[in-house]
Amino acid sequence: MLSRGWHLVMQGARQLAGPLACWWLAGILLAVLAKVLGILVGGVVSLLGLLLLSAWLPAMVARSNHESWQAGQFLYRWVLLMFTAVWWLPLGWLGYLATLQASIQLPATVQNIIFNTRYDWLPVAGPFWLLGWLISWKWLPALQRQLTAPTSWRNYWRTGWRISWWTVFKKSRNVWLFLISWLVMAIIGGGIVWASGAVSQLVSQFVAVFMMTGLQLLAWLMFMGWWSRLWPETAIAGHSNWQTGLLTLTGLLVLGGYAGWWLGTPPTAPLAIIAHRGVNGRDGVQNTTAALKRTVKQVQPDMVEMDIQPTADRHWVVMHDPTLKALAGQPGPVHEYPVDKLSGLPLREHGQKGYLSTFKQYFAVAHKLQQPLLVEIKSVGTADQLMGIFADNYAQRLIQQKGAVHSLDYRVIERLHQRAAQLPVGFITPFYLTDFSNSVAGFYSLQALTATREQISAAHRQHRIVYFWTVDRPLAMQRLTAMGADGLITNRPGQLRRLQGQSKHYYFYQLINWLVSWL
């Protein structure tokens, strides 16, 4: 496997001396440009960068075939590639999905509709996409044939239909082996960067830039080697040694400059520690005043995030789940109970006991402890219709205590903002398609699993704060801090507090962020 991999890399290196050397350099420049635009600009500009990058591949094919310019063939190849890319979109596009997300910015109200109806369409769309993706493997050889010798859509469909799925999968094993080899080298490189952090941060920075540049170069050389197998004549030397050296040096400078820019420098702003549901590990029952008191005493978090939802008689109780079954062992939705049936209800979790509080009771304890709250208003029952009453009763006191409100339902924060414009409100979203510039949200609570550099940059360009939830593992805490998060919502605020200030491995975590961004 190693010998085949090395042979492929050497074949790719010969492309830098071949007739397509300038085209390969253009591809590297476009690939870097698209990523930089996605992070720095977004919107239409980064979408244009993606379109230019997508046009490069069919142009390369035409050049490799020595074809004269034919708009029809170019468009046919481009559409085939885009059609395939759509099925492979959820797999990340080697990091360019984040660029696409930064380019397509939907109004928050539209994203709100998509998310709030997810349980209606996702059970259908998810299996449908998975089935389509598995079937799409059958058409990969057909795509390759149409790129090298385009005929018609009919032949494309017929070729894919006739070939067996297992045959295609077996033929792709070399690709998997090369990917595994690249990943192993990335792991080894990451270990070296970690070790260099113990020497000094400057050494760690240099090693991280070197490793990231090398990994990018290796990926490109593997791609070039695969190209040489399809078009062997493109690896025949066509440039003098000094021209080859100049083109190679330019490519290395582009990749190295991008690596240095992407890795950046350690953030200087303090990270907000936000205790999720008011707990510190398993020190109490979530969303209870007993857990709140222990957490504040042990950790003194910057904010305590807690959940409220309306009752049948238009009061508010502190509860995360829509039903009482998990914590209280009682049937029925919370919003169907009157407040007097809920207040003081015994709750059990992790072998501990607590009592269900009204928001008024919980808020009073937080005020006594001088603890700012981040209140999540659950979108259940008539929550969005009660924002006027909520604002009248709690907005000014939340402002005075440096608190804030966020919700998964954009209608909630929009109506609350209309009644109390000075109260900080945030939009909770598990995925990012939002146009941050036209939103009442002053901050965003984003799902940590889908965190990207593009998300943070887009929000910061519009002077929005970014929190990530729910971040409980040390690796995730460190890498999201390195990525530039303004705060982390965690069930382990004590652990996060202990990790603060341990920045000697910043470049290791940024390298991890870059590797994760390929997914």
Language-model features, listed with the residues they occupy:
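Phosphate-group recognition and catalysis centered on beta-loop-alpha active-site segments
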Residues: 204, 208-212, 223-519
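Hydrophobic alpha-helical membrane segments
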Residues: 1-271
